């Protein structure tokens, strides 16, 4: 199936590893060009090389918590490629731990990067996106049900999901679509880190997969393919939707 994105340009934050990098690979594989960002310059350089070099990718070292980063990333995309057709906003997981131990500073820092950083980028990109443009927010099952020991994510991501839904209403008349990805257990470094916090990581994995109807974790590539489809014109009538990719783990509709 031709996704109709040959030559289009997509900006992906958190695009140097995990879900963001998988989405970048899927988009480039369909002929798109990508702008990938990360706070780490070495990670940016490595991802850019893996994605095919300057003809296909622009790598940017940027921090979503920086109030100027969103405008700078959009400007860089336009300067390098001359256009911007879509954005995938993926932000690294905030600190783990129970609410009773998370400090005010941790809450503020996480709000800046996870919540405000995401909305700043959507706000900066919206005016320059074409009528068939698309914005995707990478969220998690904590949008629908709290996960143990990730209280900050449980607190922030549901609000971001509702903001995405609102943005879909606002941008819909221009033809710009906005969707969220409600991501379950995907085999990323972040998930491995959460497992390692347990006394017995192997047991934690066995217990978690036993609760997933498909009895396994998803792969970043499975997410990347879905993200590419939803960001593309193939999904031209899909907006304001929270799309689950969780192996059936969520026990509600």
Question: Which ranges hold each PLM region?
Answer:
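Alpha-helical segment proximal to the catalytic Tyr-Lys
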Residues: 127, 169-173, 236
